[in-house]
Amino acid sequence: MQTSVRRISRAMSLVAMLLVPMLASVALAAAGDTPKSVPDLSGVWEVAFGSRTRPGPGIPEQPALTAEYAQKLAAFKAAQAKGEDVESPQANCVPPGMPAIMNQPYPMELLFTPGKVTIVIEAYSQTRRIFMDGRKHPDDPDLTYNGHSIGHWEGDTLVVDSVGFTPDTALGPSQGYRHSDQMHIVERFRLTAPQTMEVVTTIDDAKALTKPFSATKVLARHRDWDITEYICEQNNRNLSDDKGKAGIILTH
């Protein structure tokens, strides 16, 4: 009897030893562990010198606004023309949010860890977290400046899907182009050369846009760069020039 018990105990121990690495592998897979076959997009990147954001094929140069949001833009331009102190959140150290935060003239760093891609953006000390573990967007996401992002690989392309944006930010190219809390952004990151990356951004918003808007930009990788500290002056205020028009003064 004791011999049988020992045999059963040894068999159970062996099964447990075999299951541990199997369960670990399953856990890594569930966490979205990056396959070895995908390209290396890690490192510090900046918008390439001489590169400009350009619209995608067949897409208009400017976002096509609905009537409601076209009125918002017209009101903004009218106030601007009068020299009024129009809203300028960045003058008060409020981050621009998506998609503008990805178009700043400051570098950003892409960090890859199991189940997650983290983008550290020097401008306004912003961080984006892209979940690669297979999760879905929340049914009712909190509205934030950079939204809720999930991602996956399509061949050699990192595809990032983001929702849940506060309507307090702008689409660009100016603060007059507003969006709603229904804005949906899809980004496609792809290497076109060892140190060059193309990012295609497509924006859809049923309330603010009559059709999706797409733009492409090129980034250059700098292997010897580091992200540095970015401090926006506390309690900053909009300033007016000698003609009474709103503006900001940059100092260093």
Language-model region placement:
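N-terminal secretory signal peptides that target proteins for export/translocation
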Residues: 1-11
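PEST-like low-complexity, intrinsically disordered acidic/proline/serine-rich tracts
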Residues: 2, 27-252
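Bacterial N-terminal signal peptides
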Residues: 11-26
